[in-house]
């Protein structure tokens, strides 16, 4: 019998600013072992909050290979500031508004039943809201990012 499991949810980025810190995200389905992970965020700490600045990051992982993009735009300034980035070693990234500094960058450390684990190569104390979608099951094979 073939199976396909999909789960979506939200978690908050760790506020531990130690480089190399791991963060476990527990899934509602304890039997689901992810084969595909999507992460996306607008780098906000409050849902549905208005900000003059725009930040967006989204990324993908197959558990071995990660890739993400990030863009930020600082508006209501004399000169608008825009930064973009692509990371072949990360699944989610955030920049410091108004600079070219990456303030947080995570890759996938592992997939296992009922969870995925991120490693924050760069971290800060901002509790960004991050959304995820995972897929798993026997119907999914040969996933490549």
Indicate residue ranges for each PLM-predicted region.
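Surface-exposed molecular-recognition determinants
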Residues: 1-145
């Amino acid at each position: 019998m073939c199976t396909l499991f999909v789960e979506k949810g939200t978690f908050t980025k760790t506020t531990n600013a130690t480089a190399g810190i791991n963060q476990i995200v527990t899934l509602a389905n304890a039997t689901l072992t992810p084969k595909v992970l999507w992460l996306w965020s607008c780098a906000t700490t409050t849902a549905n909050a208005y900000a003059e600045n725009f930040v967006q990051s989204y990324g993908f992982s197959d558990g071995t290979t990660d890739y993400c993009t990030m863009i930020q735009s600082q508006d209501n300034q004399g000169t608008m500031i825009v930064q973009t980035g692509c990371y072949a070693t990360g699944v989610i990234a955030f920049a410091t508004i108004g600079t070219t500094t990456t303030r947080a960058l995570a890759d996938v450390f592992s997939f296992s039943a009922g969870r995925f684990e991120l490693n924050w190569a760069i971290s800060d104390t901002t509790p960004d809201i991050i959304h995820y979608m995972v897929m798993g099951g026997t119907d999914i094979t040969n996933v490549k990012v």
